[in-house]
């Protein structure tokens, strides 16, 4: 048998296995939400409709955020352009029930996995505001050109948080005074101080012009 053919077959099989393991999990199923009548990929649990409804609200807020960003900045802000291009509702799903898995985004939005349950035996759904803080964190990764939690990322996260608060898509909380349990960990701080919210509401260009005087 031709060695090149064998290598080709092995490569194809490896790709199929990779796609199966990364895109499919028997613990996740598509469930129709009673809120938006759309299908959402969530864990197959007794409260799966509630989970689907939670994801319907997450996606609604995300769409509203992107829409308002575009309305406010048009095509004048590169960060907004990047987020609008990368964000897609259909790429969001619930995390599989693994002990060490929380939330993450893959390849800048190709897949956005969100943990929405407690890690104890109850597996209770998390409140929407706490989940949105985490979701906005992931959207900041989509907005950021570089990789990791660097200065660019944290500035973009503050920018997103400030506007989400302004547009009532997220309610500011003091996690230092009152930590919030989330997915087996605790959220103990926010990168955005309340006093700094106003300066992130204006455009990046306007902020830079202020610093020149």
Regions inferred by a protein language model and the residue ranges of each:
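Active-site-proximal or metal-binding-adjacent scaffold patches in catalytic folds
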Residues: 1-132, 142-213
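Walker B catalytic acidic pair
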Residues: 138
């Amino acid at each position: 048998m031709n060695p090149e053919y064998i290598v080709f077959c092995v490569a194809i099989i490896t790709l199929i296995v990779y796609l199966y393991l990364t895109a499919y999990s028997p613990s996740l199923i598509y469930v129709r939400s009673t809120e938006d009548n759309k299908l959402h990929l969530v864990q197959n649990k007794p409260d799966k409709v509630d989970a689907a409804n939670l994801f319907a609200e997450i996606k609604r807020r995300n769409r509203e955020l992107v829409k308002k960003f575009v309305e406010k900045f048009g095509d004048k802000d590169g960060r907004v352009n990047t987020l609008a291009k990368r964000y897609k509702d259909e790429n969001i799903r619930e995390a599989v029930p693994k002990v060490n898995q929380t939330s993450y985004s893959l390849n800048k939005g190709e897949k956005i996995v969100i943990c929405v349950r407690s890690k104890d035996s109850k597996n209770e759904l998390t409140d929407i505001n706490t989940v949105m803080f985490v979701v906005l964190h992931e959207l900041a990764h989509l907005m950021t050109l570089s990789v990791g939690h660097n200065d660019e990322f944290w500035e973009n996260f503050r920018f997103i948080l400030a506007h989400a608060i302004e547009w009532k898509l997220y309610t500011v909380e003091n996690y230092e005074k009152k930590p919030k349990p989330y997915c087996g960990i605790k959220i103990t701080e926010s990168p955005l101080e309340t006093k700094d919210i106003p300066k992130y509401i204006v455009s990046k260009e306007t902020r830079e012009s202020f610093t020149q005087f």
